[in-house]
């Protein structure tokens, strides 16, 4: 075992991450909506939003992670980090999202995103799916009860910082390629 990992501890995931945290949006309230088609596979950012009347669905804030819970969207890598809302703004989206939120002082929001997008976690989520063919969904309760090893908060922030810098470079290259193509 790596000597740095000696400081890691085991937790039930729901003890260190909030699942679908409660937020308030009134029926009919106009808010930013992120439909499933705006989550790009294996891309941290959200490519856009619609202004729509809230009629239901998952609710989230900046810093939350959205993960598709239905096939084939999960297998296709539809997971994103919310950062396009204004301060204290609540957005909403598909009922087919699981929303993950860090717990202040315990987990780092960007580390939560990278943890949820890790092949290890995604594989567990995919294997937990149940339902009829073509309409299978992740069993959220199984994820909530999953025992995970996590580093201390300071190390989570360091890990997320390194991975975030790599994602920033990928996004910059994507923008350069888009400009060259146009």
Please annotate each region the language model reported.
Residues 15, 111-114, 124, 145, ...:
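Short, solvent-exposed alpha-helical surface patches in well-structured domains
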Residues 117-122, 126-129, 147-149:
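Well-ordered mid-protein domain cores that form the structural environment of catalytic cofactors
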Residues 57-58, 62-118, 131:
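A short beta-sheet element
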Residues 6, 32, 90-91, 114, ...:
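Residues that recognize and position ribonucleotide moieties
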Residues 1-23, 149, 153-160, 164-182:
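Non-catalytic DNA-recognition/assembly elements of restriction-modification systems
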Residues 11-68, 73-75, 81-82:
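Sequence-specific dsDNA recognition surfaces
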Residues 89-98, 130-160:
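A short glycine-rich beta-alpha junction/loop motif
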């Amino acid at each position: 075992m790596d000597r740095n990992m000696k400081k890691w501890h085991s937790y039930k995931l729901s003890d260190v991450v909030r699942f679908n945290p409660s937020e308030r949006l009134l029926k009919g309230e106009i808010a930013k909506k992120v439909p499933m088609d705006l989550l790009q596979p294996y891309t941290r950012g959200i490519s856009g939003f619609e202004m729509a009347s809230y009629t239901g669905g998952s609710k989230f804030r900046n810093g939350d992670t959205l993960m598709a819970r239905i096939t084939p969207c999960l297998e296709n890598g539809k997971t994103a980090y919310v950062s396009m809302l204004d301060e204290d703004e609540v957005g909403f989206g598909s009922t087919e999202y699981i929303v993950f939120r860090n717990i202040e002082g315990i987990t780092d929001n960007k580390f939560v995103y990278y943890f949820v997008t890790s092949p290890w976690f995604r594989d567990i989520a995919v294997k937990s799916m149940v339902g009829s063919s073509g309409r299978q969904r992740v069993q959220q309760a199984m994820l909530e009860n999953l025992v995970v090893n996590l580093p201390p908060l300071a190390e989570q922030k360091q890990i997320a910082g390194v991975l975030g810098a790599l994602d920033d470079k990928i996004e910059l290259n994507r923008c350069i390629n888009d400009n060259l193509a146009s």
